[in-house]
Swiss-Prot record:
Protein function: With S4 and S12 plays an important role in translational accuracy.
Domain S5 DRBM: 11-74
Superkingdom of origin: Bacteria
PROSITE patterns listed in its UniProt record: RIBOSOMAL_S5, S5_DSRBD
InterPro entries in the cross-refs: Ribosomal_Su5_D2-typ_SF, Ribosomal_uS5, Ribosomal_uS5_bac-type, Ribosomal_uS5_C, Ribosomal_uS5_N, Ribosomal_uS5_N_CS, Ribsml_uS5_D2-typ_fold_subgr
Name by which UniProt lists this protein: Small ribosomal subunit protein uS5
GO terms, molecular function: rRNA binding; structural constituent of ribosome
GO (cellular component) term, any one: small ribosomal subunit
Entry keywords, A to Z: Ribonucleoprotein, Ribosomal protein, RNA-binding, rRNA-binding
Pfam family, one: Ribosomal_S5_C
Length: 166
């Protein structure tokens, strides 16, 4: 039980959306709830999960468990991203631009939840295309996953980090 308590303290969770869905059967409609949850440690690890159940708390619990199984590590430089990037998923895309210290997180709804829980404190973002919460979350995570720091770019180009900036 002690390990579970440590894990609970390590990650912060944020419910992005809760949706009531219906299955139409002969006798009428059967309602269930879906939950979209983002979890992160504010130190560069973030993930999302979805859960479905007949009760809201149970759906949230399932979503949190799913999110903890699929965490992404984010490259950060002084509280922002190393470079501008566009994350895409389906017909939704999210533009992420690094910002100067003190700018804060300029993002809407689902994108804000992902960025804050990833530990990014200064960033500009713009949601383009589809604004479905799950598409926005996945597009944001796609962008964050594809970020490269200066060392990785230098290695890909066969140069030193100093040569990149000159």
């Amino acid at each position: 039980m002690a390990r579970r308590d440590e894990e609970a303290k390590e990650f912060e969770e944020r419910v992005v959306t809760i949706n009531r869905v219906a299955k139409v059967v002969k006798g009428g409609r059967r309602f269930r709830f879906t939950a979209l949850v983002v979890v992160g440690d504010k130190k560069g690890r973030v993930g999302f999960g979805t859960g479905k159940a007949q009760e809201v708390p149970e759906a949230i619990k399932k979503a949190v468990e799913a999110a903890k199984k699929d965490l992404v590590t984010v490259n950060r430089v002084e509280g922002t991203t190393p470079h501008t990037i566009t994350g895409r998923f389906g017909s939704g895309s999210v533009l992420l631009k690094p910002a100067a210290p003190g700018t804060g997180v300029i993002a809407g709804g689902p994108v804000r939840a992902v960025l804050e829980l990833a530990g990014i404190t200064d960033i500009l973002s713009k949601s383009l295309g589809s604004n479905t919460p799950i598409n926005m979350v996945r597009a944001t995570l796609n962008g964050l996953e594809n970020l490269k720091n200066a060392e990785e770019v230098a290695k890909l180009r066969g140069k030193s980090v100093e040569e990149l900036y000159n």
